[in-house]
Structures are given as C-alpha cells and as structure tokens.
Amino acid sequence: MKVLKHGLLLLTTVVCLASANAQTVNDIVNKHINAMGGKNKMAQLKSIHMDMSMQMMGNDIPSSVTIVEGKGFRSETEMQGQKIIQVITDTGGWSINPMMGGTPQALPAEQAKQAAGQLYATGPLYNYAEKGNKVELEGQEKVGDVNAYKLRVTTRDSSESTYYIDPSTYYIIEIVNSGEMMGTPVTITVTNSDFQKTPEGYVLPHTIQTDMGGQFSITAKVNKIDINPPVDASIFEMPKQ
C-alpha cells in the first residue's frame, strides 16, 4: 500500500509540475501577444508589406517583404541594379536570382518547408497550437544584459528555433535557428530592436540584424509598414519559363 501511495504521490507531483510549466509557457506567450498589440489585433492581421534598407558589407540595399497570412511570403532585394526574388507559399516556393542565371527556380521541398514560418506575420507564438507548433520553456538565459525567457519552438514539420523574450517588455529580442550557407550548416541568429507601434496599434521591430554563423551579418532597417494592404495573389505564382 505504501508503494502505491508513493507512486500516486510521485505521479501527482509530475502532473502538477507539467501543468505549472504549461501554464508558464502560455502566460509568457499571452503576455508577448498582448505586448505586440493583443489577440484582437493579431486576428485582424491578414497581410503586411514592409519597405526596408539592408546594410551588408558597407552597401545599402533596398528590399521589401510582402506577406499574406498563412498563404504567401515574397521578398525582393535589389543588388547591382538587379532584383532577387524569393517566394514561399503554403504549397512550396521558388526564387529568381539574376546572378545565378535569372530563370525562376523551384525551391527544394525541404528548404521551402523550413521557411514556411515566414508565411505568418503574426509569428509562430500566436495561436501556436492551431499552427501545429509546440512551445517549451527552457528557463532563462542571458541575451546581452537581459535575462530572457528561452522558448524552444518546434513546428509541425519538426523545424526547431529558439526564441528569447525580454521579461520586461515581452518582445522577442533574439531568434536562433539552424540553416545552410553554400551547403555548410550554420547557426543563424536574428536580433530584433527598435520596437515601434504602428498607427494601427501593432508593435514591430524596426531594426533586424541577421548573423550568418559569424561569416557575415545583415542589418535591415524598416522604413515603412503597410498593414492589411490589398495583395494580388499572382505575385506568389512562379513565372513560366
């Protein structure tokens, strides 16, 4: 009987600890969503367009991003008078790079799958369960001077990223994930700063620095944000060769 009682006590303790951890994760996620504008605002975000300037290796590069929530992502970057385009959709992806031939190329299925998170302007934490994402709290960890919450996010396709949330603002200040550069695995670190509220009430970072495994970094400055602009779905269709 003692063994049974001890077993039940241990099981109850484990269940309670798991429940407490789940509540803590949801509490952090909810506070993050509130900090970015709130659930109602997020539910109303159907599309977004951002004009940016990127600094890379001393060059100022114009770029833009258009997202239709859950449907399509398109980025355009102008380099040396030529436009590089990358598109991700809910069914795949494609790109055009004039420096590598200039013809539309379908993205490998695995690459398109790993980039599918870019389809969501609301991010992976809003309605994460409905998106098929799993979020786990892994304690706190220093990011600069901030003792940030560390959340591991696993998407439905098993891609993993680590999100660091500032406990004083509940903004995502850093994202770490794995990627490839020239066929070599690298750790990609994205640092968000200069958070500003749009006239519509959304709080978004206006400076985004991406470090490619220490090889080089790109700093994007957001110049303009359009919330819920009309978007022609044809911009996500791969041109015929």
Name every feature range the model reports, one short phrase each.
Residues 1-25:
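Bacterial Sec-dependent N-terminal signal peptides
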Residues 56, 79, 143-144, 199:
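Structural motif
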